[in-house]
UniProtKB/Swiss-Prot annotation:
Protein name as it appears in the record: Dual-specificity RNA methyltransferase RlmN
Subcellular location: Cytoplasm
CDD domains cross-referenced by the UniProt entry: Radical_SAM
UniProt source species: Vesicomyosocius okutanii subsp. Calyptogena okutanii (strain HA)
Record keywords: 4Fe-4S, Cytoplasm, Disulfide bond, Iron, Iron-sulfur, Metal-binding, Methyltransferase, rRNA processing, S-adenosyl-L-methionine, Transferase, tRNA processing
Disulphide-bridged cysteine pairs: C105-C337
Gene: rlmN
Gene3D superfamilies hit by this protein: 1.10.150.530, Aldolase class I
Homology family: Belongs to the radical SAM superfamily. RlmN family.
């Protein structure tokens, strides 16, 4: 019998779980207090549960975590963890400390099937979706270490391995817990889902969760984006921006979108590209994040130099587009944007090989 990992259950699902056991809803608050506030994961030590309930929980439920197989520290104080889900499945997460906040970059899949040509993870292929428990466990593992060092997580970004909107239900349930005051209690603005542009999922996300949205854009036209972000061949820039407008208008509170743009030397960094990008985003409430390309083994790309990026940024500024330039962090431990490869069993390529 497979036990239910309680880290996969949001508050509503925990209510249903305890009702099925013949228990009242207040048990949900109690178990969430133990897990997310006290950080106690042994049912036998949850003293406000009856002996019979503790015995039942031990039979049918568990609170289990991936194993930490490696922890790496960068010169700039970025921390990367490598977690083992099984013998062949590994994921990575990265903590980025700054003066006023601490951001945890978490994974949603083992590998990624979207094959963005400038991304290390995309070059590895796809193996599996993470469960909600495997997503939430990343936050709890990082929290445990950081709390011991009097550091904190103020922001969570789904910008690690995988495409979050190809694992919707697990990611949305995780967001429920990240926002829930009984769990992590983060503000909706402090949790960000980054997507390469899965249009139907963005439309569903606009109704399902109020967290922030980031779009991996990387090109101002379809011809170039088709090459850099192959999913664009299915969902064009025009369709993507239309979905973005639906997202912006769906909430009762003001929403914003961050457009990510990796700067690739002689590929997408010209004055013409900057002008086209400004024109493209003028009609939308957007901020652009210019990201210096982080090199990895066997890549065909190089990063634009600082002067080119600053010129690109100035053009966007002059046309009213809010723009920032991301500072590369954690590069010496392969923790920078686009470098999260992990150890991935590439089933996608194996399946394709069998077909031909």
């Amino acid at each position: 019998m497979n036990k239910q990992n309680l880290l996969s259950l949001n508050q509503d699902a925990l209510n249903d779980f305890f009702v099925c056991l013949g228990e009242k809803h207040y048990r949900t608050k109690q178990i969430m207090q133990w897990i997310y506030k006290v950080h106690e994961f042994d049912f036998d030590k949850m003293f406000n549960f009856s002996k019979s309930l503790r015995e039942e929980l031990n039979k049918i439920a568990c609170i289990e975590f991936p194993k930490v197989v490696k922890q790496k520290f960068a010169l700039d104080k970025v921390i990367k963890w490598v977690l083992a889900l099984s013998e062949d499945n590994y994921i990575e997460m990265v903590y980025i400390p700054e003066k006023d906040r601490g951001t945890l970059c978490i994974s949603s899949q083992v590998g990624c099937a979207l094959a963005c040509t400038f991304c290390s993870t995309g070059m590895q292929g796809f193996n599996k979706n993470l469960t909600t428990a495997e997503i939430i466990a990343q936050v709890l593992i990082a929290n445990k270490y950081l709390n011991s060092k009097t550091k904190r997580i103020s922001n969570i970004v789904f910008m690690g391995m995988g495409e979050p909107l190809l694992n919707e239900q697990a990611v949305y349930n995780a967001c429920d817990l990240l926002l829930d005051d009984l769990a992590f209690g983060l503000s909706r603005r402090k949790v960000t889902i980054s997507t390469s542009g899965i249009v139907p999922s963005i439309l569903r996300m606009s109704k399902r969760t109020p967290v922030s949205l980031a779009i991996s854009l990387h090109a101002p036209n379809n011809q170039l984006r088709d090459k850099l972000v192959p999913v664009n061949q299915k969902y064009s820039i025009e369709e993507l921006l239309k979905a973005c407008k639906v997202y912006l208008n769906a909430g009762t509170q003001e929403r914003h979108i961050l457009f990510e743009y990796v700067m690739l030397k002689d590929v997408n960094d010209s004055t013409e590209h900057a002008n086209k990008l400004a024109k493209l985003l003028k009609a939308i409430s957007a901020k652009v994040n210019l990201i210096p390309f982080n090199s990895f083994e066997r890549t065909q790309y190089q990063s634009s130099n600082a002067q080119t990026i600053e010129k690109f940024q100035d053009i966007l500024y002059q046309q009213g587009i809010r723009t920032m330039m991301r500072r590369t962090r954690g590069e010496d431990i392969d923790g920078a944007c686009g470098q999260l490869a992990g150890k991935v069993l590439n089933k996608t390529k194996k399946l394709n090989a069998r077909k031909h």
